[in-house]
Amino acid sequence: MPPLPLITAQTEEKLLAFLTEHGHTKFRTQQVLDWVWRKRVTTFDAMSNLPPALKNLLAENFRFHTPEIVEIHGSADTTRKFLTKMEDGSLVESVIIPAAAAENGEKSERVTLCVSSQVGCAFGCKFCASGLLGLKRHLTTGEIIGQILSAEAIAGKRVNNIVFMGMGEPLSNFDNLADALEIITSHRGLEIGARHITISTSGFVPGLKKLAAYPRQIRLAVSLHGATDEVRDQIMPVNKKWPLSQLIPALEEWNRGRNQMPTLEYILIRDINDSPKDASHLVRIAKRLHAKVNLIPYNTVEGLPWKRPSEERCRSFRDAVHKARIPVTMRYEKGHDINAACGQLRLRKEQEKSGKTSR
């Protein structure tokens, strides 16, 4: 017999439909959600203002569960990575990132959590550890939400900024992602504003078209990493199915009617995509999309051949983009000393389990 559905995976619409079918009012739905999300109870018995019959109904049809964090890795810059085990034993990663101090020295209250959307990844970007073991499965809505709840419990603080930049391609798990977004943004859920949520895609065009029709103003980051088909074909297999000639129009469609700038994520890899010519191609795309650029010097993955460019080369690339009046930042990945780049911690753990740790 399959386990009962998670109460934390129910959108307000779905829970309302269930309770209405069983003769309960919208008010009762609101009460239940208040207990789940405002008071953070973990049993139905704790919902003291509900009638016993309703508590029994909930207990017979739903359950509470948060995934287990099996490893926590701290970092000198206070970033922490969590390795989280799902009920079937699958491992995923999340990273909690406190904001840096503001320029005026005041403490920022932003707490960002990077979450995963799949166990592994099918897209096989050549520089990324997540795809080395392939795709195992999609995460459920409850497992996506569970990462947030587990991280908050360990950190002792509420997350107020979420980036879907962990393991997996979020837009290929769109239905579960959409339900998770409803719970995250809902006034009767986690209540995190849509503009404090970023979805990253490697260029999965069918999912981008669905996201374009999605009503909430979720931010978008595109893992571009190459500004020509020649470069993207070399390091991102997704480009062979959805090349730039399809990706860029899909991004324009997403941006139509929105007052938002997409972010072009661009990992700088030595002798692959870090030349002045590459910078010129990137500028051309950024101007067409009215996008900002986030440059990330490559975070070395054991067993892969790619190298990080020199700091001088990285700065030169950034300056070329900046001179073209494109908003650009250079992000050195926090947590470089804790395997914090996408997929590295899970890869190491799986290799240890199979006795195939790379040397």
Curated annotation (Swiss-Prot):
Q: Where in the cell is it found?
A: Cytoplasm
- Provide the E.C. number(s) assigned to this enzyme: 2.1.1.192
Q: Is Transmembrane there in the keyword field?
A: no
Listed binding positions for [4Fe-4S] cluster are C121, C125, C128
Q: Which UniProt keywords apply?
A: 4Fe-4S, Cytoplasm, Disulfide bond, Iron, Iron-sulfur, Metal-binding, Methyltransferase, rRNA processing, S-adenosyl-L-methionine, Transferase, tRNA processing
Cofactor note as given:
Binds 1 [4Fe-4S] cluster. The cluster is coordinated with 3 cysteines and an exchangeable S-adenosyl-L-methionine.
Q: Which cysteines are joined by disulfide bonds?
A: C114-C342
Gene Ontology process terms (BP)? rRNA base methylation; tRNA methylation
Other facts noted in the record for this chain: Reaction proceeds by a ping-pong mechanism involving intermediate methylation of a conserved cysteine residue.
| Name of the protein | Probable dual-specificity RNA methyltransferase RlmN
Question: Which gene specifies this protein's sequence?
Answer: rlmN
